[in-house]
Amino acid sequence: MKEVSPTGRVLGIDLARFVAIVGMMAAHLLAPRSGAGPYSIGWLTALTSGLPSALFAVVGGFGVYFSSRRYLAHDQRAAAVVSLLMRGAVVMIVGFALELLPDHPIAVVLVFFGLAIACCAPLVLLPTWILVPIAMGLPFLGTVGGYGLSQVLVAKTPQASSSIREAVSALFFTGYYPAVTWVAYLLVGFVAARFLFDEGQARPLAPRALLLAATGAIAFGAGRLISALAMPSAVEYLCQTYGVGTDRAQQYIAAYHRGVPLVPPPLSFALAAPHSGSPADVLVSSGVAVAVTGLLVAAFSRATSVPRVLAPFAWTGAAPLTIYSLHVALTAATWSATDAGASGGAGTWWYQSEFWGQMIIILVVGTGIGLSGKRGPLEALTSSAAQQAARRFTADP
């Protein structure tokens, strides 16, 4: 198989990023047709409900690891923290900029993602044995806080908030992608990256990656089992509380919950409703993310260069911030130009076909970035800002 020259990147991680981006694109452009008569693709809604964004966040934890390990290897702890704080700030700024686009149906993840990166900045100084219980405990905190605050605060984004209190609540607990949950995802990825890439590991990379994938699969299975056991009680609660039938209650649970559990704790702890951020949901979604990432790293663990046939996908995945922002901008442009929101465009075949058009565009852009030998423009901006911020804390920038 023909190959392109090595880049020093981890091929499996770039491919995992690509899978995450395509999954989110499918959630935004293909899944809205789920249940739409003869074009029904309900299975796709189930597949893309929360899983691609979780993969995006977990692989983001790998990015936190890669961007901080050089500083930490030289005991430049302050530089590592400041660098990540700046990265998080830049990502948040990009996210706020995307919120200024014309109306569109996408809940932009970048404001929450950037905040989560900033929150992780001091945590990278901690040993793994402390990070693991933190990652495990955050979904419990998020579920309790999110459910409690959702009873009095309704804002899902800081932009939609009517007060500072609502904005803070949306960012950390009640938003579409609350930071408390995304910090947990980032820590899962960060710990996984330590397991795979820290020096001194006894086993080769491929066996470690396969063990990681197996761990993710076990986590997924455990989460689904726990949720299945909790489902009858959750359905009964919804039926009694809202006066709905069993089928409608199950539909409520299967729908998007955007960071807020549908039933109160402690029952919500065990219910893996998509986007709820519950412990069971995080166990299921992060399990899938870890399994996918582990398998891709294992499959290409011996690659010293990028196979030519995979180069467009790897190059596109290597610029996730740029490509994701491009996807949001393209979708907003279509939504605005066609007045899709008013005309129900998300349920039409032509809106679904935009997925394939955007796929071509992002692959062309990603290939162009790869052939240039440079980073994506937003990746370069983020990296430059982080390095400049860290420079004053180290003599070796």
Annotated model-derived regions:
Residues 1-397:
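Alpha-helical transmembrane segments and their immediate juxtamembrane cytosolic regions
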